[in-house]
C-alpha cells in the first residue's frame, strides 16, 4: 500500500537522525495519512481519498475542497486532484456556482 497523499502527492521523505554526539544515521519520515471523504459542493459528489493531515488543515483553512483546488496551483496537486479541478472549472463555466465562498 502506497503512503502518498492523493491530493498533493506528498510522499515519504528521507533525512538524518542526529544523535547527541552529532552522528548522523539515515532515517525516513512517513506521511500522516488519513482515509477521508471529501465533498465537492459544485459537483455534488463525494471523493474517498487518502489525505495527509497537513493537507486536511489547509483544506479547512481555505474554505473547503472546491476552493482549495481552485486556489491552488496545478503543479502542487496530484494528477487525480487536477482532474477533479478541471471538472469543477467546467461545472462553474456551465453555470453552477460555489454556494459558500468567493472565487
UniProtKB/Swiss-Prot annotation:
GO biological process: translation
InterPro entries: Ribosomal_bL28 (IPR026569), Ribosomal_bL28/bL31-like_sf (IPR034704), Ribosomal_bL28_bact-type (IPR001383), Ribosomal_bL28_sf (IPR037147)
GO MF annotation terms: structural constituent of ribosome
Highest taxon in the source lineage: Bacteria
UniProtKB keywords: Ribonucleoprotein, Ribosomal protein
Cellular component per GO, a single term: ribonucleoprotein complex
Similarity annotation: Belongs to the bacterial ribosomal protein bL28 family.
Name of this chain's protein: Large ribosomal subunit protein bL28
Originating organism: Anaplasma marginale (strain St. Maries)
